[in-house]
A protein has these predicted regions:
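Bacterial N-terminal signal peptides
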Residues: 5-15
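Sec/Tat signal peptide C-region and signal peptidase I cleavage site
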Residues: 16-20
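Divalent metal-binding segments
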Residues: 23-33, 38, 42-301, 313-344, ...
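Short, glycine-/Ser/Thr-/acidic-enriched flexible segments
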Residues: 37, 57, 64-65, 80, ...
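Distinct, well-ordered alpha-helical segments
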Residues: 177, 293-305, 363-376, 399
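His/Asp/Glu-enriched, well-ordered alpha-helical/loop segment
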Residues: 217, 344-384, 388-389, 394, ...
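A short, structured beta-strand-centered segment in the mid-to-C-terminal lobe
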Residues: 399-405
């Protein structure tokens, strides 16, 4: 009898830790201690502890001054650098999330052999016969060879899988891919090259094979990629309408890697959200490129969606980066005829808006139209903005500042170089000029097809003014490391009306933060070139660890 009682007590004692663990299984509370936590708040405080409870920041300050729930998980950072979760105020994450095949991001490669090594590593993990792809966010300038890889190079790297290697325009494939595309009637050169319509047709053929499950897998890869670099919120700026998209009621289409069916392109993001597997916050802006004065697509969006509809993981936030066709000779005085009518409609319905611009003439035309709209419907409370902004004049800065317009600046010139820049001028954007003007400024990438998504490469360009070849192309417009990071965090929530929720580590805000692999703020430890090697070792979204490189 005594033996049985002793055994029962022993069993119960062994079960206590398991019971305690089960009792805490509900908890999302997280405490990070002994870090250099850069809050990016108005005082730019650096503290040692942050605690997140129920998805929101509950305490920021010195270690040991906050009462903890017994179920709070504590992580000792041992002096590591912590920053708020990064926000990209203008990208095309949704396009990235639905790339066909098993995609490889080659945006950080510096040579063709390095890119081929990335493809080879990816091929080791994909099912037999599956496509290995690299679609967008690179140009031949990225590689020291300054060219596309050849069919032979792709075959050597990935002989057992078809490959599609495409930039914004030309593409190349390997022997297995060539055989497939030619069976579809798509012309492929002897060296694997696909040019013009052939490249678009090849991409369309791959997309036609995708199932929803394929797209969901691609979306999971896309979010895992950005979370490794600490990007916790993407402000997505939509897609061009692909030829053949139904129910457009307007004939504007634009084939290529920047295009998709505008109605179904969000399926995989919605699926992840419904399954509670969306780990990066996504804010959606809706493109319209209606050619007619009736503005059918824009009108459908405005009538059938609600501003700010959604939750704090997925939300519809605005209209942009277009409201009407934008392929005009702006310098020659040609403008889209329905542009003002489109923007008047957007303002009337109370939507946030952001406009793409690639020249001074485009910036000036946009600003003049914003002033006309503002005279009818004040837009300051709507947080309208102008995007990209390679050049701008002082008068336009002051005019936009006066009506509450912001500037969303993007480093696509890192890949593109100084081509198209007026002689003797910085390539842009004018980061320092706009920052010093006092107008609201934020930063992002415009990635998804033409620019690098890795935010630390974008920040490198902001700090150094150097492009992917090492050439100084944006002299005089460099900003400090602290300014660059602030533009990528605390200053970006404004563009989608969530400045009080995101962008800094402050009590009450959503618990998004990143533990870095090195001290970004110390140039003695991280050189300017070393900024490109910054990554996350721990990414937290709403108190959940969504990327863990500390294990």
């Amino acid at each position: 009898m005594r033996i049985s009682a002793f055994l029962m007590i022993a069993v119960l004692a062994m079960a206590v830790p398991a019971v305690a663990q089960d009792a805490c299984s509900w908890s999302r509370d997280l405490r990070l201690v002994n870090g250099n936590i850069h809050t990016m708040d108005a005082q730019n405080r650096v503290v040692n502890e942050v605690t997140i409870q129920e998805g929101r920041i509950a305490y920021v300050g010195p270690v040991g001054k906050h009462k903890l729930d017994p179920c709070t998980r504590t992580i000792n950072l041992h002096g590591r650098t912590v920053v708020p979760g990064l926000i990209d105020d203008h990208n095309h994450f949704v396009l990235f999330s639905q790339r066909p095949g098993y995609d490889v991001m080659v945006e950080t490669a510096t040579s063709i052999p390095e890119a081929m090594s990335m493809l080879k590593d990816r091929a080791k993990t994909v099912p037999a016969g599956a496509w290995v792809t690299a679609i967008g966010d690179w140009t031949p300038r990225l590689f020291k060879e300054n060219r596309l890889p050849t069919l032979a190079e792709l075959d050597a790297a990935v002989p057992d899988h078809p490959v599609f290697f495409a930039t914004f325009g030309p593409a190349v494939t390997n022997t297995l891919g060539k055989k497939f595309f030619e069976s579809k009637g798509i012309a492929v050169g002897a060296n694997g090259a696909l040019a013009g319509p052939a490249a678009n047709a090849a991409l369309a053929a791959l997309r036609q094979m995708q199932t929803l499950e394929d797209k969901i897998r691609s979306a999971e890869y896309a979010q895992s990629y950005v979370l490794r670099y600490g990007l916790t919120t993407s402000v997505d700026m939509g897609v061009f309408a692909d030829p053949g998209s139904p129910d457009l009621q307007d004939d504007f289409t634009f084939p290529g890697i920047a295009s998709a069916n505008p109605w179904t392109v969000y399926q995989q993001i919605l699926a992840l959200d419904h399954q509670h597997k969306l780990n990066e916050r996504v804010r959606l802006f809706m493109i319209s490129m209606d050619k007619t004065m009736a503005l059918p697509l824009l009108t459908q969006r405005l009538l059938n969606l609600f501003p700010d509809f959604g939750d704090n993981m997925l939300r519809v936030s605005g209209i942009g980066e277009f409201a009407s066709p934008w392929f005009s000779n702006f310098a020659g005085g040609q403008h889209p005829a329905n542009y003002e009518a489109a923007l008047q409609l957007v303002a009337k319905h109370g939507w946030t808006y952001q406009q793409h611009t690639l020249s001074l003439a485009e910036v000036q035309f946009t600003a003049q139209t914003y002033e006309k709209v503002n005279a009818v419907t004040p837009i300051a409370s709507l947080h309208w903005s102008i995007a990209h902004v390679p050049q701008i004049d002082p008068q336009t800065i002051q005019a936009m500042k006066a009506i509450g317009v912001g500037m969303a600046l993007h480093g696509w010139k890192y890949l593109q170089g100084a081509q198209g820049t007026p002689a003797g001028q910085p390539a842009g954007p004018p980061y320092r000029t706009l920052l010093e003007s006092g107008i609201h400024v934020g930063a992002g990438s415009d990635a998804g097809d033409i620019s690098i998504l890795d935010p630390w490469y974008e920040i490198y360009y902001m700090v150094t003014g150097k492009d992917c070849t090492g050439a100084l192309i944006n002299p005089g417009e460099q900003v400090t490391r602290e300014q660059a990071l602030r533009m990528y965090t605390a200053d970006n929530g404004w563009f989608f009306h969530e400045g009080n929720e995101l962008g800094s580590i402050e009590s009450g805000k959503l618990g998004d933060l990143v533990v870095l692999n090195d001290n970004y703020f110390d140039p003695q430890k991280v050189s300017d070139e070393g900024i490109k090697q910054i990554k996350s070792v721990l990414t937290v979204v709403g108190g959940r660890v969504v990327y863990d490189g500390l294990r």
